[in-house]
């Protein structure tokens, strides 16, 4: 499970990890935007995007596939959902926080990124700063992407997964 604020680099890392390992990538932004596309831009997705992610994770894990959950996971209830799926399916969960400690760099990423998701509006830098973030006492580690090549960050992520798994 990769957690982090918008602009931290978690989706980029999740894609690279999926490409490297063959794990199924579950990106909550996709599910949430699909719900908005189907129900209108003002539709309040609430926790429904996460519920879709949990259901898909369960499905793939029961088939013996590895899964990468790419979501903000800013609060404990979101993380608890992923943990419950891991417990239910008898699989291990590895929780890693992705951060960008350089706020200017994170803001630049948000201003210039291509989401690859039809209809998804960009997160504004000021909205990133307003986000609630609850510390995760069960995190296996943190990858700071600030000022670093993505390949180095992927290497750090792979090391954390190997150490924990």
Where are these regions (language model features)?
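Small-molecule kinase domains that catalyze NTP-dependent phosphoryl transfer to phosphate-bearing small molecules
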Residues: 115-156, 163-165
